[in-house]
């Protein structure tokens, strides 16, 4: 009997010691763990997108090289320079103009009024031709630049690069439209220049006729 009571007492004590130990095991909930993992992955993805956006916005939109060609050089003379270049020219204003005026077939000998008029007319026409030649060269360069810009647009890695490149293309188109109007006006001015040359020649001939008439006493 005593032996039975002793065994019962030992078993009871053993259960008392084991019970707290069971409470130390971690209770695992698969559903909760899956939800926590999904939240962590979503947070990491948002962080990656944020970093990518910051990098994109701080990289000059990836078109720094294109922005250097944003402003196309204007080869047309300004309004204040028209008289000096086309209508009352004193010297050739470009390489093309200098080549035209230096041709021996256009050399004018003498320092009389008629010689000065001819030199002025030749120089003015040469400057007009030089302006047109320079603009043709500029258009060739622009065509090449536009091809590079289109290639850049196709290589755009994000919407910001594509937007800026499209803006550059629109700027170039706008510049071309303006220069097309300028070219039309230049043609009008060249036509006026040719008419003015004829009037100047007629005026010079009239002066010579008047001088001759004075010599022979034909004028009152």
Curated annotation (Swiss-Prot):
Entry keywords, A to Z: Crown gall tumor, Plasmid, Signal
Leader sequence segment: 1-23
NCBIfam families, sorted: PRK13860.1
Family: Belongs to the virb5 family.
Function summary: VirB proteins are suggested to act at the bacterial surface and there play an important role in directing T-DNA transfer to plant cells.
Name this protein carries in UniProt: Protein virB5
Organism: Rhizobium radiobacter (Agrobacterium tumefaciens)
């Amino acid at each position: 009997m005593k032996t039975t009571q002793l065994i019962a007492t030992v078993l009871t004590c053993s259960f008392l010691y084991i019970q707290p130990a069971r409470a130390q095991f971690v209770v695992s909930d698969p559903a909760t763990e899956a939800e926590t993992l999904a939240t962590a992955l979503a947070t990491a993805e948002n962080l990656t997108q944020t970093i990518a956006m910051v990098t994109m916005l701080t990289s000059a939109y990836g078109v720094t090289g294109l922005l250097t060609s944003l402003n196309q050089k204007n080869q047309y003379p300004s309004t204040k320079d028209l008289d000096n270049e086309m209508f009352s020219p004193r010297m050739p204003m470009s390489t093309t103009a200098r080549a035209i005026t230096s041709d021996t077939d256009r050399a004018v000998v003498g320092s009389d009024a008629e010689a000065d008029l001819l030199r002025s007319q030749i120089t003015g026409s040469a400057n007009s031709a030089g302006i047109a030649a320079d603009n043709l060269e500029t258009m060739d360069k622009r065509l090449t630049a536009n091809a590079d810009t289109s290639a850049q647009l196709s290589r755009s890695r994000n919407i910001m690069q594509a937007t800026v490149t499209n803006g550059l293309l629109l700027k170039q188109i706008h510049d071309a439209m303006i220069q097309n109007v300028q070219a039309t006006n230049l043609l009008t001015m060249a036509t006026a220049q040719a008419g003015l040359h004829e009037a100047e020649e007629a005026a010079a001939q009239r002066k010579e006729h008047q001088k001759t008439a004075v010599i022979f006493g034909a004028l009152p």
